[in-house]
């Protein structure tokens, strides 16, 4: 059996991807609205490389003998696997290519702060190793809402780090909460309209 800890979350568009556990939980774990990893007895944990390799071996058997189709994409599970150091991510990519050489891309959830930890050269190398299609929960471009919900970054940070991804050729998808401020008493009524304007300016 493959290692899966707690509730496994993935975007709808990753339904056909091979789900590979490389982290469990979230390094930030302070967003006021989020309860996705509340069922875990710890905040964040990295999977041992031997567990990752064992899961790839198991998945190889399952896909080739039972499911009968090739794997074109692998999705790393956990709230933000992209926080892992460059060397670790490259090791994981090496393992995925060893057992699934046909896999074209590797995706994951990522925080804006995870991208900030990587240099431009490292991001380009990660793209070359197959990392592409990151899902980033930016939620909003409104500074007050970002602070209130304790996201841990600013709207300017979102733009800066996503430009780094653009330069590296790494695609990404945003998760937006379109009414993030609308029902927030601290921000006042009608702020959802204001927020949409701020998001348009950011985009």
What do the PLM-derived regions correspond to, one by one?
Residues 5-54, 58:
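Canonical Radical SAM [4Fe-4S] cluster-binding loop centered on the CxxxCxxC motif
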Residues 44-47, 85-87, 147-150, 184-189:
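Short, solvent-exposed loop/turn segments at secondary-structure boundaries
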Residues 52, 89, 119, 158, ...:
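Aromatic/hydrophobic pocket-lining residues that form the small-molecule binding cavity
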Residues 61-160, 166-167:
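Conserved SAM/AdoMet-binding glycine-rich loop
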Residues 90-95, 185-202:
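Short, electropositive alpha-helical surface patch
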Residues 113, 137, 141-147, 165-195:
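Conserved strand-turn element in the central/C-terminal portion of the radical SAM core barrel
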Residues 126, 165, 197-203:
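Generic structural signal for hydrophobic
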């Amino acid at each position: 059996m493959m290692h899966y800890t707690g509730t496994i979350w993935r975007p709808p568009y990753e339904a056909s991807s091979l789900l590979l556990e490389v982290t469990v939980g979230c390094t930030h774990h302070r967003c006021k609205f989020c309860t996705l990893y509340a069922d875990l007895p710890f905040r964040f944990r990295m999977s041992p490389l031997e567990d990752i390799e064992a899961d790839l071996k198991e998945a190889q058997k399952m896909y080739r003998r039972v499911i009968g189709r090739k794997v074109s994409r692998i999705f790393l599970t956990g709230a933000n696997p992209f926080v892992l150091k460059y060397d670790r991510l490259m090791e994981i990519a090496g393992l995925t290519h060893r057992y699934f050489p046909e896999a074209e891309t590797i995706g994951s959830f990522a925080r804006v702060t995870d991208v900030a930890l990587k240099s431009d050269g490292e991001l380009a190398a990660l793209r070359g190793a197959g990392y592409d299609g990151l899902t980033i929960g930016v939620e909003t471009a409104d500074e007050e809402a970002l602070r209130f919900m304790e996201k841990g970054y600013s709207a300017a940070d979102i733009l800066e780090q996503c430009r780094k991804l653009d330069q590296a050729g790494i695609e990404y998808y945003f998760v937006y909460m379109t009414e993030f401020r609308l029902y927030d008493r601290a921000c006042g009524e009608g702020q959802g309209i204001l927020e949409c304007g701020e998001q348009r300016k950011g985009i």
